[in-house]
């Protein structure tokens, strides 16, 4: 092994590969004796490597451990701390309560210089581990970058769907999940003074608004909301059915209308025919419009954000579909020509009622998935349109000139024997042919035109078939994510212990009351001046936020009471946070965990493993005396 290392140092020189000399062997043996091995225990798995290997990536957490001059090696009474059972000056062992499988890839990155992403580890977990070890996510190899990015795409897709967390019973929002949403709605609707004494105040008056909003907006919030949703669905179907039946001859009545017009002393009689709809359909449509009007008014009065409500496309469709009915009722008694023109225009606008079918997206997940798929596949649709436009332009021009080849000499324009009189008409034929519809209204009649038609059909099949699989894959991905989120069980609130406050008597102390086991005395002023922050990793599996770091700037806010549970918006924002944002905070933070640590005398004590961010001008000994289980890292 030593000779191979020595030989590798000679490779690449002009003189070629030389055999190692005795001097080289002695130097390499001296280096091997001088280099110290380091043992890193991660989650119970011991990894052994050289300090020189860890120094390949300076500025990372493992590089700090390998630096003996920067306080990376814990010391007790000036001696090195080895693992229990090893000599005091031998290999030094450090313990980290992290994922051992991911650390193997991290350590291999130090050895080979290539960072690969494990396929059996969830993306957010690998992202958190990279943040903890101080490795930038951009160092991931290109072959693993797609695997690494999949979790972010999945998280963004999950955030798009606002599917409820309700169970199959159909009951209202229960326990903490419903309370969080109601509290969030109250906060959006205005200042809520939740007290018994304020029941008649503004808080009491606004307390019904989120309930009414959930009743008409969220079909899964309660049983009453489901009843309202089914009623709305019933009226939508009835309105669309009525709209379609109005065009059938069986429900149309022809009337002869006589008009007497007087212009000065001249009186004229005009007869005209009008088509009226059966009164029963008009009454049914009136009942449906009354329901939609009530629903629209309740939702706009109780909405948390009026601006967002007005900008919603479905709400605009509701308003445009309701307005023509009232205008028709108001103008029906007028017989002037202007009133008849307005009524004719309103009858044309009534087709907007058919767009109410899109309100079914609140009740059917598949329709929501289709809408999100269309929005997510915008680039593919643009690519499809560009391909189709290029093909239409090319083949319409080719078919026009190909049909001119068989023209007779007596026909200078060449239009007598073909339907392709000009290139714009060829656009229609090219679109129909490329989309494989083939209506048969236009077709080539010459052998050259038939050849162009065959090429156009083949090009259409190949062109349209390319973007379609991408759109289908997007639909499958969104649908599977939506189904998974619907079946996701409710998350109960978990108790998260608050971090130790700066003025707490237990701050910066170990679990035992012995002075020699404490990592720092509570009377050490330099530590407080530097704003050292501690954080217990009490629940490392709660929503993936247990490893969120706290910066020194947030140290002043630790003395204030913390919320017991983040709001749904805060949880969504934390889940969407990127690694780079967290790396900025992690650069000025440290991790605190408790465990057993081996001392120089061979005994095992309870201690605290602390990583602190200290400036270079202050030595670690000035901030806190080195004790067993304490590790100081330079800035």
Curated annotation (Swiss-Prot):
GO cellular component terms, A-Z: axon terminus; dendrite membrane; neuronal cell body membrane; plasma membrane; postsynaptic membrane; presynaptic membrane; voltage-gated potassium channel complex
GO annotation, biological process: action potential; chemical synaptic transmission; potassium ion transmembrane transport; potassium ion transport; protein homooligomerization
UniProt cross-references to CDD domains, sorted A to Z: BTB_KCNC2_4
Positions on the Cytoplasmic side per record topology: 1-226, 299-312, 365-380, 473-635
Main location: membrane
Family under the similarity heading: Belongs to the potassium channel family. C (Shaw) (TC 1.A.1.2) subfamily. Kv3.4/KCNC4 sub-subfamily.
Protein name, entry field: Voltage-gated potassium channel KCNC4
Organism in which the protein naturally occurs: Homo sapiens
Gene responsible for this protein: KCNC4
């Amino acid at each position: 092994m030593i000779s191979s290392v020595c030989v590798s140092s000679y490779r690449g020189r002009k003189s070629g590969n030389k055999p190692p000399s005795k001097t080289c062997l002695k130097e390499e043996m001296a280096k091997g004796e001088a280099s110290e091995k380091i043992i890193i225990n991660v989650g119970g798995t011991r990894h052994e490597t050289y300090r020189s290997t860890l120094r390949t990536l300076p500025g990372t957490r493992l590089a700090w451990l390998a630096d003996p001059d920067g306080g990376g090696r814990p010391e007790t009474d000036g001696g090195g701390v080895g693992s229990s059972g090893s000599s005091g000056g031998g290999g030094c062992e450090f313990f980290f309560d992290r994922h051992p499988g991911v650390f193997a890839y991290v350590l291999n990155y130090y050895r080979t210089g290539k960072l690969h992403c494990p396929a059996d580890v969830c993306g957010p977990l690998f992202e958190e581990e990279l943040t903890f070890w101080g490795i930038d996510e951009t160092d991931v190899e290109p072959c693993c970058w797609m695997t690494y990015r999949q979790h972010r795409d999945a998280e963004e897709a999950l955030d798009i769907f606002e599917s409820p967390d309700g169970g199959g019973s159909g009951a209202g929002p229960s326990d903490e999940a419903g309370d969080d949403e109601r509290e969030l709605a109250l906060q959006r609707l205005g200042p809520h003074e939740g007290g018994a004494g304020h029941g008649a105040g503004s808080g009491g008056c606004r307390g019904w608004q989120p309930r009414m909003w959930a009743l008409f907006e969220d079909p899964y919030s309660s049983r009453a909301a489901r009843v309202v949703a089914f009623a709305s669905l019933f009226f939508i179907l009835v309105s669309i059915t009525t709209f379609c039946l109005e065009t059938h001859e069986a429900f149309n009545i022809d009337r002869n209308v006589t008009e007497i017009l007087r212009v000065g002393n001249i009186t004229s009689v005009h007869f005209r025919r009008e088509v009226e709809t059966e009164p029963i359909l008009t009454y049914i449509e009136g009942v449906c419009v009354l329901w939609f009007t009530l629903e629209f008014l309740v939702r706009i009065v109780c909405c948390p954000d009026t601006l967002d409500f007005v900008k919603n496309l479905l709400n605009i469709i509701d308003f445009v579909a309701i307005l023509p009915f009232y205008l028709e009722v108001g103008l029906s008694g007028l017989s002037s020509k202007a009133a008849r023109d307005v009524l004719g225009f309103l009858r044309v606008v009534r087709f907007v009622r058919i767009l109410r079918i899109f309100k079914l997206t609140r009740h059917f997940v598949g329709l929501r998935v289709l809408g999100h798929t269309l929005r997510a596949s915008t680039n593919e649709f643009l690519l499809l349109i560009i391909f189709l436009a290029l093909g239409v332009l090319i083949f319409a021009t080719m078919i026009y000139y190909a049909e001119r080849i068989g023209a007779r000499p007596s026909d200078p324009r060449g239009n007598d024997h073909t339907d392709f009189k000009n290139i714009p008409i060829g656009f229609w034929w090219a679109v129909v042919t490329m989309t494989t519809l083939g209506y048969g209204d236009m077709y080539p009649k010459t052998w050259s035109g038939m050849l162009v038609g065959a090429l156009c059909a083949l090009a259409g099949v190949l062109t349209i078939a390319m973007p379609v699989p991408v759109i289908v894959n997007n639909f499958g991905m969104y649908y599977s994510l939506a189904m998974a989120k619907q079946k996701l069980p409710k998350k109960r609130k978990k108790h998260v212990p608050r971090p130790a406050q700066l003025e707490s008597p237990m701050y910066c102390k170990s679990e035992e009351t012995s002075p020699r086991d404490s990592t720092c005395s509570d009377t050490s002023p330099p530590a407080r001046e530097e704003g050292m922050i501690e954080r217990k990793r009490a629940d490392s599996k709660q929503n993936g936020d247990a490893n969120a770091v706290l910066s020194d700037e947030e140290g002043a806010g630790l003395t204030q009471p913390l919320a017991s549970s983040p709001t749904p918006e805060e949880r969504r924002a934390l889940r969407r946070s990127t690694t780079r944002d967290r790396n900025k905070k992690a650069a000025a933070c440290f991790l605190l965990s408790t465990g057993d640590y081996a001392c120089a005398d061979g005994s095992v004590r309870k201690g605290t493993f602390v990583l602190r961010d200290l400036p270079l001008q202050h030595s670690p000994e000035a901030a806190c005396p080195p004790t067993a289980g304490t590790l100081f890292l330079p800035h």
